[in-house]
Amino acid sequence: MLPMNNCKVISEVITMADMFAPLVAQLKANPKTIVFTEGNDPRILEAASKLLAEGVLKVVMVGNEAECKAAAAAGGFDISAAEIIDPENYAGFDEMVHTMVELRKGKQTAEECTALLKKSNYFGTMLVKMGKADCLLGGATYSTADTIRPA
């Protein structure tokens, strides 16, 4: 048995919420934008709806708008404050292709980059690269390799 004379009783319990409170306050004061590359996955929709409800981050979902909204409705998730971007209809798509070709330094053609950017993992990565978002979360349906390969 250990001697008790050197022990202090801690009466305060620190919760995870307490630990993250300063970070949450900082994010609310200066919200960052996160891109979710799998915009119709129920796990992603749940996370996005929670972040939006808490006002912690601005949310961009990549995917077909109708499919994302239908999946959210089916799961009971409110993503009405999220921006949904469909690579097939993105106004800055040509600029994105041009930037990717330059970044790849001739290793891929414009046609190859166009095909890659229609995949949400590549598209989301380029949104971050081009300053349209601050960070990206993927991997719900993509493998780890497919999630990091575009970087």
For each predicted feature, which ranges?
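Contiguous, glycine/small-aliphatic-enriched amphipathic segments in soluble metabolic enzymes
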Residues: M4-G138
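Glycine/threonine-rich beta-strand-loop-alpha-helix active-site module
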Residues: A140-A151
